[in-house]
Amino acid sequence: MSDNNGTPEPQVETTSVFRADLLKEMESSTGTAPASTGAENLPAGSALLVVKRGPNAGARFLLDQPTTTAGRHPESDIFLDDVTVSRRHAEFRINEGEFEVVDVGSLNGTYVNREPRNAQVMQTGDEIQIGKFRLVFLAGPAE
């Protein structure tokens, strides 16, 4: 209740972010993916992006559609809310069973394993940087 004459206060929307043990393992690993990443539980032909660094560290995004968009636009499949991210920054595409990240004309570019890339087929453990966000790619079992 509020003190403003019986009018209820507007509810504030909140988001909770839970950090996964995976992130800690990846930080301390010596370049190899941890033995158990949770990717083995993914549906066949899908993959997972885990935010390693950025305002929503620990968030996970399932890649199970032919094209998944990432950017600062509110209608992006992966909404990355920061000025370092373009409105329409990158797309994650499935091509013949392989996952590819494609920069779609962003201002700051898209990086895979700290190298600038316009397009790159991803492998499990690859780090994708979009603005100040760093995401780790984990592939599920092949179809």
From Swiss-Prot:
Subcellular location: Cytoplasm
FHA domain sequence ranges: 68-117
Source organism, top-level taxon: Bacteria
Keyword rRNA processing assigned: no
CDD domains xref list: FHA_GarA_OdhI-like
Keywords associated with the record: Cytoplasm, Phosphoprotein
GO cellular component annotations of the record: cytoplasm
Effect after changing T14A: Inhibition of growth on glutamine and glutamate degradation
Modification type Phosphothreonine: residues: T14
InterPro entries with a match to the protein in the record: Cell_Proc_Reg/RNA_Proc, FHA_dom, OxygluDhInhib_OdhI, SMAD_FHA_dom_sf
Entries under Pfam families matching the protein: FHA
Biological role stated in the UniProt entry: An essential component of the PknG signaling pathway. When unphosphorylated, it inhibits the activity of 2-oxoglutarate dehydrogenase. When phosphorylated it does not inhibit 2-oxoglutarate dehydrogenase.
Protein name: Oxoglutarate dehydrogenase inhibitor
Gene source species: Corynebacterium glutamicum (strain ATCC 13032 / DSM 20300 / JCM 1318 / BCRC 11384 / CCUG 27702 / LMG 3730 / NBRC 12168 / NCIMB 10025 / NRRL B-2784 / 534)
Gene: odhI
